Amino acid sequence: MRQHVNPLSRSFQLPLRLPPPSELFTHPEHPIHLDIGCARGRCILDLADRHPNWNHIGVEIRRPLVIPADREALESPHGNVRVLFCNANISLEGWMETLPKDRLQRVSIQFPDPWFKRRHRKRRVLQPRLLMAIASALQPGKDFFIQSDVREVIDPMVALTELSGCFDRPENDAHPWRRTNPLTVPTERERYVMDQQLPVYRVLFRRNHTHQPPIEEFEQHWQEIDNPGNAPTPDA
């Protein structure tokens, strides 16, 4: 059962300092995989064990999930995985800005909380500013992977990412959805959904060479598409 928390609650609006790689990993020079909304962290803990030459960091807004997950991460013999508490839309942008160029090589958002009602748009994890921060931190050719079992959740994520112009799909990837998870390790939610023989909607994007659009224009354009009834009216 998913335990939702409202990311717009006052308690989640304080920016947190996330430690730099040098304070998190035994080999901070290794490439980083960032998993946003990692829940209990089972996926990245398994990935870290299978890929010791990568560093893996999961961020999660539900603190009761973070505490046991990071405790287990700290026991890894490779020193290459951590799970941190934060609101991704408040604290991640500043952290990604401090990373050395090309250090962040993969970002994933897997089965985010299904805020699909119109009035809950601002609670979605993938907001325009976070997407632009991801686009800024990823060098061309690096991966941004998203998946969900709820069409009302994945469709806006795909539309927003495509609207940015900063990402393309791999040339030979299946459309509209990938059949397989490129990470090769399923999340707990993914296992549950597949055991029920229900569909999973997956899209792999790759950062291209397109410059990011100005954030204010991008946010306004997205508002016009995603919630046209409340879009700001240009001055006469």
Swiss-Prot record:
InterPro entries listed in its UniProt record: SAM-dependent_MTases_sf, tRNA_(Gua-N-7)_MeTrfase_Trmb, tRNA_methyltr_TrmB_bact
Enzyme class, UniProt record, top EC level: transferase
Keywords, alphabetical: Methyltransferase, S-adenosyl-L-methionine, Transferase, tRNA processing
Binding site for substrate: K117, D149
Catalytic activity: guanosine(46) in tRNA + S-adenosyl-L-methionine = N(7)-methylguanosine(46) in tRNA + S-adenosyl-L-homocysteine
One term under GO cellular component: tRNA methyltransferase complex
EC number from the UniProt entry: 2.1.1.33
SUPFAM superfamilies: S-adenosyl-L-methionine-dependent methyltransferases
MF (Gene Ontology): tRNA (guanine(46)-N7)-methyltransferase activity
Region annotation (Disordered) ranges: 217-236
Origin: domain of life: Bacteria
Pathways per UniProt: tRNA modification; N(7)-methylguanine-tRNA biosynthesis
A Pfam family assignment: Methyltransf_4
Residues of the active site: D113
Keyword Hydrolase: no
UniProt: S-adenosyl-L-methionine binding residues: D35, E60, N87, D113
Record-linked CDD domains: AdoMet_MTases
Family according to the record: Belongs to the class I-like SAM-binding methyltransferase superfamily. TrmB family.
Function field: Catalyzes the formation of N(7)-methylguanine at position 46 (m7G46) in tRNA.
This protein's name: tRNA (guanine-N(7)-)-methyltransferase
Species, as recorded: Synechococcus sp. (strain CC9902)
